[in-house]
Amino acid sequence: MSSREYDDLSHAFAGAGGGLLSMTLTYPLVTLTTHAQTMVRLKKNEEEEKENSNEDGSLSPKSSNTSNISQKKISQFEILKKILKDQGAKGLYNGLESALFGIAVTNFVYYYFYELTGKTLSRRSNPQTTSGSKKVTLKKGLSVWQSMAAGAVAGTISRVATNPIWVANTRMTILSKNQGKLGKLNTIEAIIYILKNEGWQKLFTGIVPALFLVLNPIIQYTIFEQLKSFIVKIKKRNVTPVDALLLGAFGKLIATIITYPYITLRSRMHVKSMTENNEDSEKERTDSVQSLPEDGSDEDNSKENPYAETINKIISKLPSPIVSMFIIGYKMYKEEGVSSFYRGLSVKLLQSILNAAFLFYFKEELLILSDAIIKSTKRVTGLANNPYNAKDVIHSFEKALCMRNPRSRTTTVPQTNEE
């Protein structure tokens, strides 16, 4: 990183551009991981269809719209072969358009609020930096707590804002071939389709594990910031794009290992919201909540467990998204074991590390170009000497309106002069 000061929007646009490039390069790995995380549900559907076919002969396994991967443990290579056989190489890029749209918006929002929050915290911890200039140089990095706070704010805002995009992406990636109409839509059309046919709540399916996943960038960027500070202190130089590549990859490795179970849960919830109707979901919720403390056994076990009734009452009062996440996680543990939470981890680690490495590298390379464009735009619009915020934009529009409407010129100009 250079010692020059970069605008918050420069970081936002550079992050969005870096995300687009890195996602494009690693998207086939994203597809494999998503298939691995959600494959069990598709396998279960196929097994049921095979049983029905064997009983009455009314259904042929070959006529099923669901995946017909064998019942044995599925490797990543088998998933790859299945995708290539059924859909060709383009199957590895199902949902790419929505993923690019999602990562661009996510990174733009994240980096903007990360830089904005980080600089705000730095000004408050170092009041002397606010005298004479509003800019704060972050080349030595944020403290641990500042990194975590900035990551929490930026992560929460970006997750909530982009969750509908990722719901659409998961469905387009997994079900684009089987779902017909949904697979032919672009991201905005898919979101509108879900909104009209299933309601706005479905667009925020998986928001609870998504908010838990705010821990992922917090961990990643905290590690990145601290290692960046270490390099600046020890080597007496700024961080280069290659340094950023290595530090970003290492931070993502640690963050992904810690938060991967929530990534799997989120993918399961995105698929579950479409494959099961509301009545089945409500019935499953009631049955599962009653069976959780009993560990799947008979009623006598509830008497042996003095906390069963209390746990049931607590769970019944929790918000529906939290209960749904808890039930899905419990069923995965009971039916598939702990390993189900880490299915596809190897490919995900490879994808995440490469994606983070490319992201940090491209972001550093694009930062100078992005900053030059932003500052040129500011000079043209008259905002070069001020931070780019809502107040400046409003004043710019006021000035423009005054130029077009002479009657309002005498009322608005004095207001700006007073400030």
From Swiss-Prot:
<keyword id="KW-0677">Repeat</keyword>
<keyword id="KW-0812">Transmembrane</keyword>
<dbReference type="InterPro" id="IPR052217">
    <property type="entry name" value="Mito/Peroxisomal_Carrier"/>
</dbReference>
<feature type="repeat" description="Solcar 3">
    <location>
        <begin position="239"/>
        <end position="369"/>
    </location>
</feature>
<dbReference type="GO" id="GO:0051724">
    <property type="term" value="F:NAD transmembrane transporter activity"/>
</dbReference>
<feature type="region of interest" description="Disordered">
    <location>
        <begin position="44"/>
        <end position="69"/>
    </location>
</feature>
<feature type="compositionally biased region" description="Polar residues">
    <location>
        <begin position="56"/>
        <end position="69"/>
    </location>
</feature>
<dbReference type="Pfam" id="PF00153">
    <property type="entry name" value="Mito_carr"/>
</dbReference>
<keyword id="KW-0813">Transport</keyword>
<keyword id="KW-1133">Transmembrane helix</keyword>
<dbReference type="GO" id="GO:0005347">
    <property type="term" value="F:ATP transmembrane transporter activity"/>
</dbReference>
<dbReference type="GO" id="GO:0015230">
    <property type="term" value="F:FAD transmembrane transporter activity"/>
</dbReference>
<feature type="repeat" description="Solcar 1">
    <location>
        <begin position="6"/>
        <end position="120"/>
    </location>
</feature>
<keyword id="KW-0576">Peroxisome</keyword>
<protein>
    <recommendedName>
        <fullName>Peroxisomal membrane protein PMP47B</fullName>
    </recommendedName>
</protein>
<feature type="transmembrane region" description="Helical; Name=4">
    <location>
        <begin position="245"/>
        <end position="265"/>
    </location>
</feature>
<comment type="function">
    <text>May have transport activity.</text>
</comment>
<feature type="region of interest" description="Disordered">
    <location>
        <begin position="274"/>
        <end position="305"/>
    </location>
</feature>
<dbReference type="GO" id="GO:0080122">
    <property type="term" value="F:AMP transmembrane transporter activity"/>
</dbReference>
<keyword id="KW-0472">Membrane</keyword>
<dbReference type="GO" id="GO:0015228">
    <property type="term" value="F:coenzyme A transmembrane transporter activity"/>
</dbReference>
<feature type="transmembrane region" description="Helical; Name=6">
    <location>
        <begin position="349"/>
        <end position="369"/>
    </location>
</feature>
<feature type="repeat" description="Solcar 2">
    <location>
        <begin position="142"/>
        <end position="230"/>
    </location>
</feature>
<dbReference type="GO" id="GO:0044610">
    <property type="term" value="F:FMN transmembrane transporter activity"/>
</dbReference>
<feature type="transmembrane region" description="Helical; Name=2">
    <location>
        <begin position="98"/>
        <end position="118"/>
    </location>
</feature>
<comment type="similarity">
    <text>Belongs to the mitochondrial carrier (TC 2.A.29) family.</text>
</comment>
<feature type="compositionally biased region" description="Basic and acidic residues">
    <location>
        <begin position="44"/>
        <end position="53"/>
    </location>
</feature>
<feature type="transmembrane region" description="Helical; Name=5">
    <location>
        <begin position="310"/>
        <end position="330"/>
    </location>
</feature>
<feature type="transmembrane region" description="Helical; Name=3">
    <location>
        <begin position="204"/>
        <end position="224"/>
    </location>
</feature>
<dbReference type="InterPro" id="IPR018108">
    <property type="entry name" value="Mitochondrial_sb/sol_carrier"/>
</dbReference>
<dbReference type="GO" id="GO:0015217">
    <property type="term" value="F:ADP transmembrane transporter activity"/>
</dbReference>
<dbReference type="GO" id="GO:0005778">
    <property type="term" value="C:peroxisomal membrane"/>
</dbReference>
<feature type="transmembrane region" description="Helical; Name=1">
    <location>
        <begin position="12"/>
        <end position="32"/>
    </location>
</feature>
<dbReference type="InterPro" id="IPR023395">
    <property type="entry name" value="Mt_carrier_dom_sf"/>
</dbReference>
